[in-house]
Amino acid sequence: MPTASLILDAAYAIAPVPRRLFGTFVEHMGRCVYTGLYEPGHPRADDTGLREDVLALTREIGPTVVRYPGGNFVSSYRWEDGIGPRVERPTRLDLAWHSIETNQFGLHEF
């Protein structure tokens, strides 16, 4: 069986890494959005339903770019479903995670 080896030199640097490369994304997996970032009625939620404690921790991490939607969720995301009055937004089956997407958190809230 072939083998491979790798030698790393921690002292070797080509150039500094630009901070704008440290981005992240928001995905509707598990409780990342609903009951995570967005939870209307929670004691720590602001008037729009966003959790102020989660936002503070996110700011502390300091991502330079946050993409929404992100991850596998984007494969069947319809941006039109996440805008406009929440009561008029459709509920759909999220094909990525086989769950119901209420679209209560969408592009407008992001």
Q: Language-model segments: what does each one mean?
A:
Residues M1-F110:
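Non-catalytic accessory regions flanking glycosidase/transglycosidase catalytic cores in CAZymes
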